[in-house]
Amino acid sequence: MSLVFVISPPRAGSTLLQRMMGAHSEVFTHPEPHLISPIAHLGVYGNVDKAPYDHINAAEAIKAFIDDLPNKQQDYLDALRAYTDTMYGRMLSTSSSSLFLDKTPANALVLPFLQRLYPDAKYVVLTRHPLAVFSSYANSFFNGDWQAAHEFNPILERYVPAMARFIRERPVPL
């Protein structure tokens, strides 16, 4: 199974790109599966702001557990990859395609984790002027109320630095 991740903020044209690429017989895609960002926030690679359990205790316990694994971080990444490979693979098995495309915008917020989990995947980075992204977001979901849109999701502060760092550092071929 081959994976392609479209890295993009919301409202940057990723759905159109997904539909265009998904029209190819070898590419299968599913609307924003959100498989990566939740496992990136188990407390090992990123902090959890809110959870219905003691996320601080859970993060520390998971880190201690990982430290006792024979191959430590590598065993943990292998287990997480087994989960996502299974999920992507099962979805891919419903088609005759050989490539799965994931365009979940939240993946842009966990890029160091994603590239560690899938260093051999293909990454397509889609950019759009940040103010055009935010304007589209505010107009599409908040009737043009930029303040309400920003309070709900500060897209500019979240996506621009994360994507800029990824493009600048190029940890994987783009």
Report each predicted region and the residues it spans.
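Pre-Walker A (Motif I) flank of P-loop NTPase domains
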Residues: 1-3
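Hydrophobic anchor at the beta1->P-loop junction of P-loop NTPases
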Residues: 6
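P-loop (Walker A) phosphate-binding loop of NTP-binding proteins
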Residues: 9
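ATP-binding Walker
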Residues: 12
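A conserved segment at the C-terminal end of the G1
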Residues: 15-27
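PAPS-dependent sulfation machinery
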Residues: 28-110, 117
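PAPS-dependent sulfotransferase catalytic domain
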Residues: 91-174
